[in-house]
Amino acid sequence: MHNWHRQFLGRTQMPPEVSALAISEFFKLSGAELQAVLSRYGVDMRLGAALQIGFLKMCGRPLDKLQRVPAAVLEHLCAQVGGSPPDLATLRAFYSNAPRVLYRHQQSALDVLGLIRFDATSDSPRVLEAICDKVRAGVDADKLLAETRVILYERRYVLPAPRAVGELAKLARETVERDIGGAIERAISPTTRVRWVEQLFESRADGMTRLEFLQEPPGSLRTGSITRQSDKVRTLLEMKIADMPGLPGTERYWQMYAAKMRNQRRSRFAQRKEPRRSIELVSFLRHSLADHTDTLIRMVDRRVSQLWGRASKQAKADQGALPALTVLVAGVRQAINDQEHTKGERFDAIVDLVHRYDAGDLKPLSIAARQRALLVNQIRQIRPLLKSLVGLDLQADDASQWPALIGAWKDAYTRGADDLTKTMAPPKSKVWTMLLEDPNANPRNAAEVQLLWDLRQALRRRTVHIPTSLSFQSRAAMLDSRGSTAIAARSSCPVKTMLRELNEEIEHGLERVSEAVQRGELRLDGTKVKVRRLAAQRRPPELKDIRRELYKAYARVQFPDLIMAVDAETHFSAEILGRPADNETELLHLYAGILGQSMDLSASRLSLMVGLSPEGLAHAMHVLEDPAPVTRANEAILTFMHSHAIARTWGNPFDCAADAMSLDMPEYIWYTSPDPKRRVAGAATYVHTHGWQGIFSDRSIMITQRQPGPAIDGILGQALSKIARVYTDTHGFSAYGGSLGWTLGILMCPRLKNFNDRRLHVPSGGHILIPNNLKNIVLPDISLKSIEKGWAGHLKVADAVMSGRLSATTAIELQGAARHGDASFRAGHAHGLLLRTNDLLRSYTDPDYRREKLRYLNHNERTHQLQRQIRHAGSGSTRGKRQEELGAQSHCLALCTNLVMAYNTSSLQRTLDAWKRQSGREVDASIQRFISPMGFEHINFNGVIVFPFDHYRTQLLAPRWGVRGRRSGVIQPIRPGSPGR
């Protein structure tokens, strides 16, 4: 079922307006449906029967009242069943005079479509488990009602009355709560739960309760902020939350109930009834421990990268400043402090140093050695980081050195000891030996610096793990395939067959490159391949005039008008709320929340809009932090956009481009980094642009984060289109990521920076015939045996990613540079190098392929220009400290970008249709291919924000007696109650 179909389910009246997409989807009768209508009824009766069939397909309920039926629907049906469309009054009068005919038409439609009426007593058990699965997946409130209607519709039931749907959803929620509550009752004693409640609402020395302290978002990367984040984890560990036994339920379910504790008052919490009270308590505690633990590790990881990077930069800067003299001074100082030798021996050592200096034999320390020395001198910044990590609930294999090492350091920090015992000594390393044995330095400081780096790497490779974490669990737990049958798309392909076919492609590619060199199309310069610049693409001569006319036809529009115009076609607001808005106030708050998140508008700016309340705006912001409904809204907009004929000329629906765009953020947020180009602090949104245009996937990332993982995750996490190929830039590709993507059925096609300088990696051992003129640019260093040896482990990682147990981002981090000794990593890395070679060979000899890469990536850049125009105000709010807030900004920015492109696409199609209808003028598809929907010159994003409800009230608001049986005159907030209730 399309996401945009959900908005119609449960209606008993025809919407006042039905889009052309909905008419073609629901009121176009199939061959069997048309035959049934024509064979059963005469000309006068066919229209009513066909109308009932179309309405049942659209809404899942019979059409009871004919208060309104759009003329376009009647015309479309009459064109199929014959006859001329009557006016609505005639049709209504016909049914009023013959009520039995209405019933027969309804029953006939049920028979034709194979629908059965829902009986609550006998049919509820058949669908209850499916609805319970939705509850376990974290679906609640109005969204659960929408999912219940979808489940009933897909099982061919006639949707019952709203009250029956609500009772069914309530039964499913209570069933799951009873199961989870029973598990909590058996696993956690009432005394323990009472103690946890007392501790949560107990005040700290700073006046905050523990609940308020644990809900505080993380700060910057300063030592004080990291220490405060460590205090949150320590608070939860002291409450023995890590000892909580395993409980049923998905992480999304626990997160949903944990959110209900936000800003909770003790009096309100005491009024909660069991089992919900215990579920909310346990959910909050276990989710807080996992979330704060992950955040602390990420903060320490970023701080370590920051400190190591600064030290490296300083070491490089100091390298040219009298390096030999610096070594001489250090040697003289060491000789003077050497108390084990006599004064004469120390004097002779100094003289020897001076002679070596005069002879030029003194060599400075390497940059890496100077970097380590600088870090040891920064122990006041290093020690709090190590203390924060050691204080976590770290676990490791008993056979490794980590359990004893972590225990020794944890005990030393607890006792306040400042010595370095044998059990605290980190693993021996040649590069750290000099600092550990330097008599002028404190060996404990050097040991702490080394241990911090080693522990960071161990957490990355999961040799040290945390059972209560979400992202840093053990490698075995992450790759555990029990309970899942999902496998990677190419898991069934034998490795030998795959390598043979890939080798053949590479060999043919080398032949093409060799022939191109002989013809003079390519030139070799040592190990480089000189590729000619692409010639300007030939465009139809009439393109410029047609494009100008099409863009000139755009009507100048205010952004709020544009939002409501597209919402009237797609009903994306109903997707976000889980139902049509009840009144203008609710819809206004939702629109304001979307604008506030996408444009990062401050609360003072939003408060200028008439009719907003702080409580309603807070609710709207909270609703938008849930990514699932916003994703469905985006898909509804894209489905509408791609339904236009012009969109299908813009590219291939199985291709996409992926790239990141920076989002300006305040510097005091821990995950911000300076944009390398603009030197402005911010995070980034990683977007995937569809071949038919439009952003179908987006996610928030850090600017410094490697992007192959998000490039793969964005494709796997969407259901709009079956993407088989993704075009990326250099940052979006790595050898291992390319192999992982190929295994998952995604071919990564990178546009590499300086691709002329890239060596062509091919199999060693003579498996491929290398032309003589390409010997210098080909590097036969890939072992096919190593690929075959580690391929099974590589497929195991791919299967875990496909099943959702592991994200591609985490998998690439897990298998990354920290695991060079792992056979599965070596297999994936070597296979990725072969894929990169194959792509380079095609790029060298196929100009059309290179041009297609540039075209897709340029479209992505045009999309970023539109996003920057929408978000031109920069960081005007203080939101974004929590990951959910940053994700909401990314999702809403993609939503607004798609709104603009969908509006432009619809306008372009209307203009083309008007040309064809009025003068018979048609524009060839080869010309439409060059028409872009990303223009924004005709849109005013500034000024006073006013939404024209008078024009769209009937299309967007729930009917007087709508799906939920509630009168539209009653103002309902987006979520009932004030924040925290």
Predicted regions and their residues:
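Long amphipathic alpha-helical coiled-coil/heptad-repeat bundle
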Residues: 2-500
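Short, conserved catalytic/metal-binding motifs centered on acidic residues
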Residues: 60, 606, 656-662, 726-731
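Structured, charged N-terminal subsegments at the starts of enzyme catalytic cores
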Residues: 504-607
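Electropositive nucleic-acid engagement tracts
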Residues: 581-582, 598-652
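Active-site-proximal, Lys/Arg-enriched surface segment
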Residues: 627-684
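Electropositive, glycine- and tryptophan-enriched low-complexity nucleic-acid-binding patches
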Residues: 676-717
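Acidic, metal-coordinating catalytic cores used for nucleic-acid/nucleotide bond scission
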Residues: 726-736, 753-759
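Long, compositionally biased intrinsically disordered regions
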Residues: 779-981
